[in-house]
Amino acid sequence: MASKRSAGQTIIVQPFLTLASSSPRRKALLQSLGIKFCVINPNIDESVSQFESAVAYVKRISAEKAATQTPKNTAVILAADTCVSLDGDILGKPSNARDACEMLTRLSGKVHEVHTAVTIKSETRIETLLVTTAVK
């Protein structure tokens, strides 16, 4: 947090946050924390590159979302991406209820991994963090 002095007073200036995500869950999470932010929908190609691992994929997509054009008063950009992998295959987002049922059937009783990458970008720095969880 930065501070400014004005006529003998210190004014705290909060960095303005932009959430680069179309996820309603991520938006709701920030709202529940009382954080002020704006939302942009990062219009990027989320296709998996040939031979790309799940970890490399979520880190790349998260970083690309953070690199999206943002409002001028943005000090910090927050972006994230999550994917599920099973036996080295990246499972995409189901497009309908049938796809979702097929995916759940494929995952049922098997250990699979959920990878989430979070990218935080400021004017001077960019950091991407990764969390992988094994789920059965």
Regions found by a protein language model. Name each.
Residues 5, 13-18, 31, 53-136:
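Anionic-ligand binding patches
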Residues 34-51, 127-131:
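Short glycine-rich, Thr/Ser-proximal phosphate-binding strand/loop in the N-terminal lobe
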Residues 16-40:
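N-terminal G-site helix/loop of the GST-like fold
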Residues 23, 43, 82-84:
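Short glycine-rich, polar/acidic loop-and-turn segments at beta strand-coil junctions
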